[in-house]
From Swiss-Prot:
Keywords associated with the record: Cytoplasm, Methyltransferase, rRNA processing, S-adenosyl-L-methionine, Transferase
Coiled-coil residue windows: none
Annotated GO CC locations: cytoplasm
Protein name: Ribosomal RNA large subunit methyltransferase E
Active site: 148
SUPFAM superfamilies: S-adenosyl-L-methionine-dependent methyltransferases (SSF53335)
Compartment list: Cytoplasm
Taxonomic source organism: Methanosphaerula palustris (strain ATCC BAA-1556 / DSM 19958 / E1-9c)
Major site of localization recorded for this protein: cytoplasm
Binding site for S-adenosyl-L-methionine: 51, 53, 69, 85, 108
A single GO molecular function term of this UniProt record: rRNA (uridine-2'-O-)-methyltransferase activity
């Protein structure tokens, strides 16, 4: 653990409270502000490892909670997990089989950063596009979504794409985000319903 993490008060608080990362507080802030999770909702969390959002989700709903990630997610009581690529039809079908009706799709994932701003931005937008595609193919009409993104040249295009699929779309900066970060969340409510088509790749 680097000195930056060791000195991070929010990180230390998360560890003391039993969360796997500081990201748990970001979901708590989103829920407090937008009430995207209802007490009986079934939730699918994309890019869920190490599982801090799953820990919070389990406390917010009596419904099913499932995390999807390329890497194994350490077990959490009452939470199902799938190891695989969220863009594949096999994983999407597995999610449907396990969860049934999907009311909420969440994605706090971000790509491994290379240090090259344009490249990292493109990969982050691509991940957001994949999450939106997943939601469009699996979510029940009227469902809600929240996903992490990063401000930059292509962010507005992703935001406009999300607006095609949800009646209400907002952006949100959490207090738990590190100072100076371009991280931003897209919060989308009341899924319109679609055939699952998301237009192309954002250029």
């Amino acid at each position: 653990m680097g000195s930056q993490w060791g000195k991070d008060k929010v990180y230390r608080r998360a560890m003391n409270e039993g969360f796997r990362s500081r990201a748990a507080y970001k979901l708590q802030e989103i829920q407090e502000r937008f009430s995207i999770i209802r007490e009986d909702d079934n939730i699918v969390d994309l890019g869920a490892a190490p599982g801090s959002w799953l820990q919070v989700e389990r406390t917010l709903t009596k419904g099913k909670v499932l995390g999807v990630d390329l890497n194994p997610i350490p077990s959490i009581d009452g939470v199902m997990t799938v190891v695989g690529d969220l863009t594949t039809s096999e994983v999407q079908q597995q999610v449907k089989d396990l969860v049934g009706v999907v009311n909420v799709v969440l994605c706090d994932a971000s790509p491994k950063l290379s240090g090259h701003k344009c490249y990292d931005q493109a990969r982050a937008i691509g991940l957001g596009e994949d999450a939106l595609m997943f939601a469009a193919r699996t979510m029940k009409q009227g469902g809600n979504m929240a996903m992490k993104s990063f401000q930059g040249e292509m962010f507005h295009e992703l935001l406009e794409e999300v607006k095609k699929h949800f009646y209400v779309v907002k952006t949100f900066h959490t207090k738990s985000t590190r100072r100076g970060s371009t991280e931003i969340y897209i919060v989308a409510k009341n899924f319109i319903g679609s055939s699952g088509d998301v237009e192309g790749h954002i250029q």
